[in-house]
A protein has these predicted regions:
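N-terminal first transmembrane alpha-helix
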Residues: 1-78, 134-142
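Loop-to-transmembrane boundary segments
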Residues: 9-22, 85-110
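Residue-level detector of alpha-helical secondary structure
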Residues: 12, 16, 91-94, 98, ...
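Alpha-helical transmembrane segments and their membrane-interface junctions
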Residues: 31-35, 102-127
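Extended non-catalytic scaffold regions that mediate assembly and binding
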Residues: 45-53, 97-100, 116, 120-136, ...
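Transmembrane alpha-helix boundary/anchor motif
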Residues: 61-69, 108, 112, 116, ...
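Cytosolic juxtamembrane helix at the C-terminal end of the final transmembrane segment
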Residues: 69-77, 143-169
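Membrane-interfacial, low-structure loops and terminal tails that flank and connect transmembrane helices
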Residues: 74-90
């Protein structure tokens, strides 16, 4: 019997970093959405605010040091780790504010996605407007968050490349 030696494909560092972000965001949603009173309030603004700030802080304190010091993150053919490592104090402060703002923006986009999905399904199924067909949960939230985050960072990288003149658009 011939034994075939198969070579496993190596998972790229970008995929590992994305999976790490997905896991961290899901964990934050689980802790904040289910473990605090913000998840039970009738006003979604509290949940959006605390999720945005919480995910932003965990990104700054946990994700960025791990992702940019362990993985080689490649965007547009360039390893972008040096953008994180070689920053001065004021640039780190701006990046911190940017990470918080981006987290808030992405959480708002995910919330609006859930709202629109539910409104569509309520109209399609003829249910009462107060019915929540698709409730928030960590897996779906983290998946939508990661998709929106990747789209926004891809767009900002394209805009940065166009601005510096190194774009192949």
């Amino acid at each position: 019997m011939d034994k075939k030696h198969t070579r496993r494909k190596k998972i790229s560092d970008n995929a590992k970093a994305t999976l790490l972000r997905w896991w961290i965001v899901g964990m934050c949603y689980f802790m904040i959405g289910f473990g605090t009173q913000a998840g039970g309030y009738t006003s979604p603004i509290d949940l959006i605010f605390f999720l945005g700030v919480g995910i932003g802080l965990v990104t700054i304190v946990v994700y960025n040091p791990i992702a940019y010091n362990v993985f080689d993150i490649v965007r547009g053919g360039e390893i972008v780790n040096h953008r994180y490592r070689n920053k001065k104090g004021w640039q780190r402060a701006l990046q911190t504010l940017g990470d918080l703002g981006l987290s808030m923006l992405v959480v708002i986009l995910v919330y609006l996605s859930y709202q629109n999905i539910n409104l569509f399904l309520v109209g399609l199924l003829g249910l009462s407007p107060e019915t929540v067909v698709v409730a928030g949960e960590p897996f779906g939230f983290a998946t939508l968050y990661t998709l929106f985050y990747s789209a926004i960072t891809g767009l900002t990288d394209k805009l940065r490349a166009i601005r510096t003149g190194s774009a192949t658009v």
